[in-house]
């Protein structure tokens, strides 16, 4: 989904930079506060960023002027929310633009808006809906990763169609989203399965962090929590 350097008109580069910049700035404040108040979260933040970096670096060429790849943004979004995920995505996108020729600096705002903001927002909403429906967090994280990936690409298709509405926005959007769908539908399913594996490992290894973040019900985490000396949970 990374839109390559120089592909978007300057006006659209500026628009997406401004919109993403606002969220990133807020995310930096939230991330700083989180790490100051809960320094034990640092490894989990690092894992979320690394997961996003690795998955989103596995790119396959696309004729849209972009590329297809997993996003890895659902995990961080569910754990820490959209603003912090926007910061992690910005760091990932900056490294990829500078060292992997993946994306670009002028298009970083657009790429962060899709992969660091809209996709994560979709992941958070879907995860919360799954929790309200009484589903397990494992099921919730699968669908969060799935829809986080899909909505990232829907957003990129919208961005490309807005920049190049030929012959119309609707026609351009349809063209871009159909091309993406061939690779992204199966990729998102695979990403969902991989995210479940990572999630269940975190749940078994550090259930205390998930409990502190309030993203998994205590009842679901009880089998993994270490009993106290008095025999309590």
UniProtKB/Swiss-Prot annotation:
Cellular localisation: Cell membrane
Keyword Secreted: no
Pathway terms, separated by semicolons: Cofactor biosynthesis; adenosylcobalamin biosynthesis
MF terms in GO: cobalt ion transmembrane transporter activity
Entry membrane topology: Multi-pass membrane protein
Leader peptide range in chain numbering: none
Transmembrane segments: 9-29, 43-63, 75-95, 107-127, 138-158, 177-197
Record GO biological process: cobalamin biosynthetic process
Gene Ontology CC entries for this record: ATP-binding cassette (ABC) transporter complex
Keywords carried by this UniProt record: Cell membrane, Cobalamin biosynthesis, Cobalt, Cobalt transport, Ion transport, Membrane, Transmembrane, Transmembrane helix, Transport
InterPro entries in the record: CbiM (IPR018024), CbiM/NikMN (IPR002751)
Family: Belongs to the CbiM family.
Assembly and interaction partners: Forms an energy-coupling factor (ECF) transporter complex composed of an ATP-binding protein (A component, CbiO), a transmembrane protein (T component, CbiQ) and 2 possible substrate-capture proteins (S components, CbiM and CbiN) of unknown stoichimetry.
UniProt function note: Part of the energy-coupling factor (ECF) transporter complex CbiMNOQ involved in cobalt import.
Listed name of the protein: Putative cobalt transport protein CbiM
Species this protein is from: Methanocaldococcus jannaschii (strain ATCC 43067 / DSM 2661 / JAL-1 / JCM 10045 / NBRC 100440)
Source taxonomy: Archaea, Methanobacteriati, Methanobacteriota, Methanomada group, Methanococci
């Amino acid at each position: 989904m990374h839109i390559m350097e120089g592909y978007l008109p300057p006006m659209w580069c500026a628009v997406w930079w401004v919109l993403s910049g606002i969220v990133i700035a807020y995310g930096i404040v939230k991330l700083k506060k989180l790490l100051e108040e809960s320094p034990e979260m640092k490894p989990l933040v690092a894992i979320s960023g690394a997961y996003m970096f690795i998955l989103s670096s596995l790119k396959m060429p696309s004729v849209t002027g972009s590329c297809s790849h997993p996003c890895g943004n659902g995990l961080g979004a569910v754990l820490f929310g959209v603003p912090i995920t926007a910061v992690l995505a910005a760091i990932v996108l900056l490294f990829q633009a500078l060292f992997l020729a993946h994306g670009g600096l002028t298009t970083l705002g657009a790429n962060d808006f899709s992969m660091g903001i809209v996709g994560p927002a979709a992941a958070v909403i879907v995860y919360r809906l799954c929790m309200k429906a009484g589903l397990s967090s494992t099921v919730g994280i699968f669908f969060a990763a799935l829809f986080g990936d899909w909505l990232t690409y829907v957003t990129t298709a919208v961005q490309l169609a807005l920049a190049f509405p030929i012959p119309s926005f609707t026609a351009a959007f349809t063209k871009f989203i159909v091309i993406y769908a061939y690779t992204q539908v199966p990729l998102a399913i695979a990403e969902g399965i991989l995210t479940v594996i990572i999630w269940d490992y975190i749940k078994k290894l550090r259930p205390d962090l998930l409990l502190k973040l309030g993203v998994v019900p205590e009842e679901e985490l009880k089998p993994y929590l270490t009993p106290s000396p008095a025999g309590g949970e």
